[in-house]
């Protein structure tokens, strides 16, 4: 872009010189843009990791990771699992793989039938993590006191029979 003329603007006694652009023969910008995604990297799941955390660490999307790894439930990843993570995908997808929220589900599919309690867990939070009703989780764990969950305690997750 070249500046060929100068226009003077006056505002209540203030003068300012503003350059005026004149068209040049430069080529117009291309109408199509290309995207080059980043590499796919291996990531080992660590304590307290979720797909949200992993996706934020590696500039990816929850569903980009879930789809590449054929995860049946993106809300559950196993500690120590090695995930393939597409870094900097052209389209970051954080929603297409997520089930519609419902607190009435009595069972789930595609996950382990067991869950190990971690710090801060409650029956409500575990039920929410697996998209289950609290009643269904309690029914699968007769004898477990939901108010006295212990770190590393293993509880049952109700699995749907297909």
UniProtKB/Swiss-Prot annotation:
Sequence ranges assigned to domain LysM in this UniProt record: 41-85, 113-157
Which residues are modified by glycosylation?
48, 94, 104, 131
The yes or no answer to whether the keyword Repeat is present is yes
Q: Write the signal peptide boundaries.
A: 1-16
Q: Which InterPro entries match?
A: LysM_dom, LysM_dom_sf
What causes induction of this gene? Expression is up-regulated during plant infection.
The phenotype of cells or organisms lacking this gene is: Leads to a significant reduction in virulence and a reduced proliferation of the fungus in plant tissue.
Q: Which is a Gene Ontology cellular component entry for this protein?
A: extracellular region
- What is the annotated localization of this protein? Secreted
What is the recorded function of this protein according to its Swiss-Prot or TrEMBL entry?
Secreted effector that enables the plant pathogenic fungus to manipulate host defenses for successful infection. Binds chitin and acts as a competitive inhibitor of the chitin elicitor receptor CEBiP and suppresses chitin-induced immune responses in rice cells.
Further facts: In plants, chitin acts as a microbe-associated molecular pattern (MAMP) that is recognized by lysin motif (LysM)-containing plant cell surface-localized pattern recognition receptors (PRRs) that activate a plethora of downstream immune responses.
Comment field on protein domains: The LysM (lysin motif) domains are small globular domains involved in binding chitin in eukaryotes. Slp1 contains 2 LysM domains.
Q: Which family does it belong to?
A: Belongs to the secreted LysM effector family.
Query: What interactions and quaternary structure are annotated?
Result: Forms homodimers.
Q: What is this protein called?
A: Secreted LysM effector slp1
């Amino acid at each position: 872009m070249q500046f060929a003329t100068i226009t003077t603007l006056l505002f209540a006694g203030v003068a300012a010189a503003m350059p005026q652009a004149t068209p040049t023969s430069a080529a117009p910008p291309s109408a199509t843009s290309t995207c080059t995604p980043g590499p796919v990297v291996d990531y080992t799941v660590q304590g307290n990791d979720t797909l949200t955390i992993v996706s934020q660490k590696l500039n990816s999307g929850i569903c980009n990771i879930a789809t590449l790894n054929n995860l049946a439930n993106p809300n559950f990843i196993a500690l120590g699992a090695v995930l393939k993570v597409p870094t900097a995908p052209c389209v970051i997808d954080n929603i297409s793989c997520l089930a519609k929220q419902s607190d009435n589900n009595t069972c789930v599919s595609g996950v382990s039938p067991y869950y190990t309690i971690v710090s801060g867990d409650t029956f409500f939070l575990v039920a929410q993590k697996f998209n289950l009703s609290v009643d269904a989780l309690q029914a699968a764990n007769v004898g477990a006191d939901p108010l006295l969950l212990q770190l590393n305690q293993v509880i049952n997750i109700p699995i749907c029979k297909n």
